[in-house]
């Protein structure tokens, strides 16, 4: 009995759905992001959309040092701290774009600790990119532009199994990041 085009399409769709479900289950089982600061920060960023007028960007020095509530009390602003671990200049750029897409920003502060500028791009430190993009909105163009800049097609392949992000490095997988 010949299979119709509709049956073949249904089989392909079922395969894609089962593969996606399997990858989602593996992600759930292998990646513990319950305590991920970046996940919480980005959830709060999206929940606060339209209200932010002052933004703080930078590495851990920023997110551990700036208290938006104290800034708001002193300046009468509605500030947000979008700092994250290992945030490099390109990460700050994409966080600025992500925030500016939904907010009318008046002031942006960029923390510039010197060791953060030993590497200017996340292509040399993939985890710096993944800490942000893993939790950015799935419909955000900034997420995909940042991933493309960091690792090209290889970075998109890594979206399928985030458990790999802990081992992703240019030295460990040289052909992948060229």
Where are these regions (language model features)?
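A broad, low-specificity signal for short, low-complexity segments enriched in glycine/proline
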Residues: 13-20, 39-43, 68-73
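N-terminal Lys/Arg-rich, disordered targeting/topogenic segments
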Residues: 1-7
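Secreted/periplasmic serine-hydrolase-like ester/acetyl group-modifying domain
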Residues: 125-178
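Alpha-helical transmembrane signal-anchor/signal-peptide segments
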Residues: 28-51
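Acidic/glycine-enriched edge-of-secondary-structure segments
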Residues: 23-33, 78-86
């Amino acid at each position: 009995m010949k299979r119709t085009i509709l049956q073949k399409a249904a089989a392909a769709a079922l395969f894609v759905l089962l593969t996606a479900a399997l990858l989602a289950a593996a992600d759930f089982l292998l990646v513990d992001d319950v305590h991920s600061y970046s996940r919480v920060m980005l959830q709060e960023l999206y929940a606060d959309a339209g209200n932010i007028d002052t933004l703080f960007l930078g590495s851990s020095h920023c997110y551990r040092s700036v208290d938006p509530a104290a800034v708001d009390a002193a300046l009468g602003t509605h500030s947000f701290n979008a700092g994250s671990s290992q945030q490099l200049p390109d990460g700050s750029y994409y966080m600025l774009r992500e925030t500016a897409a939904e907010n009318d920003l008046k002031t942006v502060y960029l923390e510039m600790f010197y060791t953060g500028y030993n590497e200017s791009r996340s292509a040399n430190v993939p985890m710096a990119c993944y800490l942000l993009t893993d939790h950015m909105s799935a419909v955000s163009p900034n997420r995909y532009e940042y991933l493309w800049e960091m690792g090209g097609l290889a970075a998109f392949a890594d979206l399928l199994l985030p458990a790999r992000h802990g081992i992703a490095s240019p030295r460990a997988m040289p052909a992948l990041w060229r």
